[in-house]
């Protein structure tokens, strides 16, 4: 049977032009409407739509509120296109039009019938998902009913439900009374005669091995009975007396209060805890022991076998441990995916590098394990004791965007202090991202006695302030640093940072005042610097680097990086550090820093006294500029940028003394107006200095001696050189140049002696004598000549 609708078509809204798929005799027989499930609007030709062609119309109005456009042919049965009159000429065309109009009317009538409520192929009426309106109430069982009739029926059902609720409340009241009875043990159900009464019973004896103290609740065939009205119980005879006899087959259930619970043996067993809903089983006592301050993941279904995915169980345990301690069994390893700690709590386990570990599941097929293994979102402190969080050997991706961090704390954006986490004796190692991340603006975090190794990026990154990292072992980062600090007032002490791809410790700060302490740490065998510190600008900086040990840094490029690098800032304190080599021997192949201390961008220390070995501690020099103090095994250098000053109590006090070990007096002393020298057996007395009696002169205390050797120690006065000859009484001098031999100069003459008795009397060359008659000159040793004074 042809069931197609030919004269009506509906289009979804959205377009503006629509086709007319049927033929029509006149445009007035075509109706265009906007339609929705509960509304219809007939449009007017020309003002609300118009014909684009004979078979196409265009809408001129908005379709908001409607979801379909309907085009329907509705041919008038009374308004004939062709009207026949008696005696008129009958033409075939007119007959055709008249016949077509009749056919259209019939076709539209058939479509209307199909659209009203047609029959399906089985003869059933089909409302086609539309409402049937003005339906009378049903009478017979097979009649349809209308909504009013249904509402009335449901209202009656609601009354029945209300009665059921009343019974339920009554039942709860019984239970409450039952629970409030604190004089005995409660909660045992008893069924009479196997669930089927004989019939006619009004007295029922409860036959149980233990005494029943009360029967607070009875049901007969599901109907509750009121104690004192519909039944009574006599505890001495253990008898229930009913107001109405039981019928045959009645089901009577009583709830009793007794001195002995049938469940007691079950609950006391080794699996008794499973009877009260715990997932890990065990005894009830063990479950009670775990309920107090400690939470264990086994209570939530964790296996800890190193194979099963315990994510859901461990996360449930974390959620339940707010303000408590989550205890990880020291003998187990919990495989997990990403975990979140949303509140303050403590996690404790068996010890660093022992049991009780949280292990990332890692990549599985195409699924990449990335993000943060443990993310702390709590505003308060989260503390971990003896916890191992180890990703070494797990399948992880070392590609940016797909890396897995170990433990990360979210940044603090509240504008007030939020505490950082605290780690004690933990091990967090082996992640493809960062092992440990302290959130920005988080303060007072602690990492102590912890091992943190083998991250692919930096091992520890702290973005907050006032953190303390102590007695922690950090190393073997794949591409990053050991410890990276990005804010002020942090302290790293008693730590080892080793074998990192880049630097052992890095502190950089973009703005603000810098403050950082590095105390008693060992930084060795790092690819770049031992410690690198970059202040934002020249400022009084609170950088303290004290009592640390540096060796074999700059391994990625021997002699390029430095043990200590400081950029910008003044007032840095660098004291007591030791710079050494792993192989202190000639020809050693171990890497060394370019400088022990490298000062960049004008960085200036306030105090810098380090110990180093000139032969093995560096490749280039101790420091890149000669303005710092330095100590090695046998010298002490005071930087050229400083004036060495020693204050004394008076002008006669000694300021500096140089002693030989075991001697009581100095060999040399500075003070009391000069420099004095001695033998160590008495106070120094000879030397040079200043005396007010001889202004503008250097005074020799207790004499002045000059060796006077012509080739090593001539005595100079202005441009004159004076030295001793090779004979007694010979003294030579020369002006302008050093002598080339012992006699390369003029001989001082003018020694006056007693007149000789003869020409061979004793005398030295140059001696002169005079008496009343002669002038005597010793021209050679013991050889004299004389001339009469009268000849002059």
UniProtKB/Swiss-Prot annotation:
One of the Pfam families matching this protein, by short name: Phage_T7_tail
Does Lyase count among this protein's keywords? yes
Q: Which GO terms describe its cellular component?
A: virus tail
Q: Which residues form a coiled coil?
A: none
Q: Which GO terms describe its molecular function?
A: lyase activity
Sorted keywords for this record are: Degradation of host capsule during virus entry, Degradation of host cell envelope components during virus entry, Host-virus interaction, Lyase, Viral attachment to host adhesion receptor, Viral attachment to host cell, Viral tail protein, Virion, Virus entry into host cell
Instruction: Tell me one GO biological process term.
Output: adhesion receptor-mediated virion attachment to host cell
Q: What is its main location?
A: virion
**Subcellular localization(s) per the UniProt record:** Virion
The protein's matches in InterPro entries, at most eight in alphabetical order, are given as: Pectin_lyas_fold, Pectin_lyase_fold/virulence, Phage_T7_tail_fibre-like_N
So what does this one do? Functions as a receptor binding protein (RBP) and probably mediates the attachment to the host capsular exopolysaccharides. Displays a depolymerase activity that specifically degrades the K30/K69-type polysaccharides of Klebsiella pneumoniae capsule, which allows the phage to reach the host cell membrane and bind the entry receptor.
Please state what the annotation says regarding this protein's domains.
The N-terminus anchors the RBP to the virion. The central part and C-terminus probably binds and degrades the host exopolysaccharides.
Whom does it interact with, and what assembly results? Answer: Interacts (via N-terminus) with depolymerase 2 (via N-terminus); this interaction probably gives rise to a branched tailspike.
Task: State the family it belongs to.
Answer: In the N-terminal section; belongs to the Teseptimavirus fiber family.
Protein name, UniProt field: Depolymerase 1, capsule K30/K69-specific
| Upper lineage | Viruses, Duplodnaviria, Heunggongvirae, Uroviricota, Caudoviricetes
